[in-house]
């Protein structure tokens, strides 16, 4: 059974109104601060996964930080499609894209309370780099996941040349 029909790389402005609405819901599920999301949307490449009806079912926002480093700014899978390996597939797709773009490192930042996300990234080869304290204290509404208040930001990275050497 095919769950998705394609992964496309698009810009926000290239999306239809319906796809923008579907994507906005996904973006907000990963980062509830819409103003923050809007601050990076113009600068990212959107990797969007569509189902066969052309509905947005998953997204990943990738920012090129400099000539060889990239950051995953946002990753979300529609709730009714979670647990099917789509996030892992998107991450793998993006890692291959970064390699083809001659990138050497991918960063991702997530909350200290995002236990599922921390597990996912580590399963994909990311390693913890450092913690930025109190990043989420300034959010308008406190964020709780699995009963844990999200306060600190955990920074993970994957060094692609090391990944190739170990395979």
Label the model's feature ranges.
Residues 141-149:
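Short proline/glycine-enriched turn/loop segments at secondary-structure junctions
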Residues 71, 76, 107-109, 155:
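Conserved beta-strand segments that form the floor/walls of ligand-binding pockets within enzyme
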Residues 98-111:
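Conserved GNAT acetyl-CoA-binding A-motif
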Residues 3-80, 91-92:
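Acetyl-CoA-dependent GNAT
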Residues 77, 83-96, 123:
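Conserved acetyl-CoA-binding loop-helix of GNAT-fold acetyltransferases
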Residues 108-118, 129, 133-139:
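Conserved beta-strand-loop-alpha-helix junction that forms the acyl-donor binding cleft
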Residues 44-46, 150-155:
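Short hydrophobic/aromatic beta-strand or adjacent loop that forms the aromatic wall/cage
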């Amino acid at each position: 059974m095919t769950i998705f029909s394609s992964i496309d790389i698009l810009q926000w402005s290239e999306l239809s109104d319906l796809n923008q609405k579907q994507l906005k819901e996904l973006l907000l599920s990963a980062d509830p601060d819409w103003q923050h999301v809007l601050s990076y949307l113009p600068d990212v490449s959107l990797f969007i996964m569509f189902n066969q009806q052309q509905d947005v079912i998953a997204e990943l926002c990738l920012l090129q930080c400099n000539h060889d480093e990239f950051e995953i700014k946002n990753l979300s899978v529609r709730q009714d499609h979670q647990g099917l390996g789509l996030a892992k597939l998107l991450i793998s797709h993006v890692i291959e894209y970064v390699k083809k773009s001659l990138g050497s490192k991918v960063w991702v930042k997530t909350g200290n309370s995002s236990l599922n996300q921390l597990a996912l990234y580590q399963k994909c080869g990311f390693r913890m780099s450092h913690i930025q304290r109190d990043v989420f204290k300034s959010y308008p509404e406190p964020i709780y996941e699995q009963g844990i208040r999200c306060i600190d930001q955990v920074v993970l990275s994957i060094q692609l040349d090391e990944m190739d050497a170990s395979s």
